[in-house]
Structure formats: structure tokens, C-alpha cells
Amino acid sequence: GANMNKMGYVGEVKSLISELMQYNVRPDALAEFLEKEPLGEGLRLKMQDVLTMYQGFTEYLKGRYITAEEVLELLYDVAEESELLRNSVIVLDEFTGFTPIQNRLMEKLLVLAKKVSVSVTMDVREDFYQCRGVHELFAMSKKAVASLLKVAELCKVPVEEPLVLPTGKQRRYANAADLYFMEQNLFRPGAGSYRYKAPEQSMQHIRITSLKNPREELKFAAREIVRLTRENGYRYRDIAVVTGDVQQYGNYVPEIFEQYHIPYFIDQTKNILFHPFIECIRAILEMIEYDFSYESVFRFLRCGLAARVVTEAKNSDKEPDPAATEDLTQQPETGSHGLTEQEIDRLENYVLARGIRGASRWSRPWTFVMPDGTLEDMARLNEIREAVYENFKPLLEAFRGKDNTVSTQTYELYSLIRRLDMEQLLKERGNFFEAHGNQARAKEYDQIYKIVMDLLDKVTSLLGDETMTIREYSDILDAGFEAAKVGIIPPGNDTVTVGDIERTRLNHVKILFFVGVNDGVVPKAGNQGGIISQFEREKMAEYHLELAPGAREKVFIQKFYLYLNMTKPSERLYVT
């Protein structure tokens, strides 16, 4: 109970329930496990709490919604009805492993399909069917092979002899003996030392550089990319940048790559929590919670989407202040068709000077004329005051009424968003970014309104009849905003891909920049967080309850991903 209000706790519970679903551990199976197995008292009580939440969650959703984790289970139920799957040829490429729920679906696919081909990454010198432990470099691949063979045996489906592709020396590494040697020896027991004949040819395809910070690393990469494309004829699509911390390095990529005119695509889903639209909604709720405090009011008015809280200025024929004019090559204009930045400044000065706080002060006319002001200025300030208060009044009343439900509160929030014409403002911003060549930002603005509307719909559907305080309501929306992501598709074919060593899938890469190869980043430091500890996971595994890999196993998994990335480029590897 006390943990419920801790930052990130809801996310941890969500992750654990998602994990249980992915690994096909249903509430009844978990309940049976807790009843039969002699777990320690602490772990038992913890998992009992998890079971209570898990049961409540699944019971509440029954007949209303399905989770993303249940999609494969539904496909399993209807797969036999699909003409597309029957007698088809299915190819599974670049899978590093399969969860229990995926293996369950494979049972149907093996029976229905004419042929199923699965590719795995493994050294031809390895025993494909024997794994001595998670410490082996190709343990994930061997585990995937073992699970597929088990499914095939269960379904009585014959398994063909494995097709082993030729080694890289004759193909990818024909002109890069040093890269081929690294691929054959990296993380292998008894690895040898590279020997070369001519010093000038030594390690010419592998370069290790030390730089002082992420910005300098990316500047180095950008300069090399420009040189390689201009002098050596490489295309941008031949080049990729990977890192163990795409969140940090991704913050510097737009500025640096645009400075060097390099087209790029960052392969990550972006958190929306700090998007201007989300910031605006959070400011709106803060105004209600803190009763029109100075800080909350101007957080809202300066969020960039509050321009239409008031109609266009009557004195719009005045010349704009050149000092306040925005550089339209950088940001879209936000003050058109309504409230301007100059007016917000004047309003803020007046509110500060008069100490105006509280909705009641905003509901009554302001009469004091500032020494440097005019009656016309005062009339405009009152026009803005009235527009702000009248727009917010229905939402204010929705949260002040004791019997008002979440459905009523959400409807009034939605109505305010509509009155402020935010959907149109977001479209205008998206069009601006598209016109200025920033496709990623344009796509972000295209998606954000629908994401928020879907969240409000879900809140209404799930909690519509509940009553709650403004703080509880804000926390629920924040949890939804924190979980929501914006996905961006590549803007074109000829771009440099910037990605994560685990998530990003690279094909036909000739040159790879591996940046941020530092302790704690590659491999990542073990995450000690989570509801279930590493020890508890191992304890549960002893009793045959399979969950996602723990911190110890993840270290070896990262080593495998490190191998995959460092052996991707066929011609040059840069490590910084």
C-alpha cells in the first residue's frame, strides 16, 4: 500500500504483470505455484500481493479489453481458421529467442504451414544442440534451437538437417582480414592474437578512439561520415551508429548531424511525458489543483499551446515588438490568432505586482491601473482574465463537486482541449516541422493528439464511475503519459541509422560507429530494481517457474548482442 505513491512503482507492477503474461504464467498457475512450492515467507507474501493485483487486473479486463501480451494467445485460438497460414512458407529471421507464449503459437504454425524456416546466429564450430550454461556466447541461440526442437517433437513434425551458411571470410570479410579475425575470436575461449604481414595494413578496418564526452564522440563520427561519403563514395545507408545508451546519445544526434547535413534516423520510441501538449495538460490540472496559483497559470500560458485561450487581440493593428519576434526557422509561431507573448508578459507583470492568486481573484474584474498602463491596456488584461477563467470554470467545477465522476471530469478536460483548439495548433506545428524538413518532429506531432485522446477514452471506460481527487486523477494520467510512446518511421531510404545494441536490427552495414563503449554502459550495469530480485528469480526458477532473464543472465545476453553488433560491419568498425 505505501509503495503505491512511489515514483515508478506502477510501472514496475505493470512490467511484472506483462512479464507473467509473456511467459504464459496465468493467475491460476501462479496461485497453484504459491500453494505447492516451499518458498521463503518474504517471497511468498510478495508474490501473493502480485497475484492479488494480477487477478484483479485480468478480472477487470475480461470481456472488455485485451492486452498486447494476449494478442499471440488470441492468434493461437484462431490460427486454424486462417487461409493465409495454411500451407504457407514461414521464415523467422533475427529472432534471438522465443518466450513460452511464442513457443505455444509455434505449435500451431508448425502444423499449419507447409514449411517453417528459422535462422539463428551461431558459430559453425559450435555444437548446435549442446549448451553448457548461460555463460556461453551462443547460449541464446542454442536455447532457441532446443525450444523449437521440443515443439517440433510435441507436434510430431519432422526436422530437416540444419543448413549452415559459409563463413564470412569468403563473403562479407573478403577484403577485411582483421574484421574476419575478430569475428572468429571475439569472446571465444583460447582466442589468439592477430598477426599481420605489412604494418601499413595493420588493423586498417578497425579504429579505436578515446574522446572526452558523448558530444565529441558524435562530432568525430559526423566528420568521418562526411569524409567517407565524399571521398570514398559510401552512401548514408551503408553507415550506422550504435550505442548502449541511445537515450543519452540520441539527445545530441539531431543538433550535430544536422550541423553536418547528415540525414539520420534514430531507432527508438520516444517518451511523450515532456512533449508540449502533455506539458500543457499537466499545467491545466495543476491550475485546478493549486487554485490558479501564479506558477500554475503561467506554466499553462507559456506552454506554447495556450494562444487560443482568448480571441485575437483587438489592438492587433499595432506593430509587433521586433525583439519578441521568434526565429521562424527554428520554432513555429505560437502566438498567432490570439494571445501573444507580449500580452503574456504584461499579464504576468500585473499579476505579480498585484499579488493575484486564486480562482476567485480571476473571476472578478481587475480595476487597478498600473502607473505605466492605460485604460485600454486594463481592458485587454480583463478580457484575457475573463477568457482564462471562463474557459477553466467548467473543469474547476467538475473537480470541486464531491459527487462528480471521472467520466464527468474527463469530459470537461476534453471540452477544454477542444475549446482551446489544440488539435489544430498541433497540426499547424506538425506542418511547420514538415515544411522545414524535420520529419521526425512532424510525425511526433501527427501522433500525439490521438495518443492523448485514446488515453482519455481508456480512463473513462475503466474508471468512469469512480470519484477521485484532482491529485489522484493527475497521478493516473501521469502514469499513462509515462507509459505512452511515439514511434517514428525512417524518413527515407538513404539515412544513417542511430540505434541501440539490443533493439536495432541492422542489415548490409558496411561501416559501423560503436559509440559510448564505457564501463557501466557496455555492458550495462546490472539493474537492481524491480519487484522480484535476482535471487528470488533464481529461487523461482528452481521450482520450474520460468520468467525473463535476471541481472546475471542479462550480462551474458549483452555480451551476445555486443558480438552481434561488432561483427555487423563488412568493411570498417569504429569504437569510441
Would you name each region that the model predicts?
Residues 1-576:
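Polyanion-engaging groove/track-forming segments
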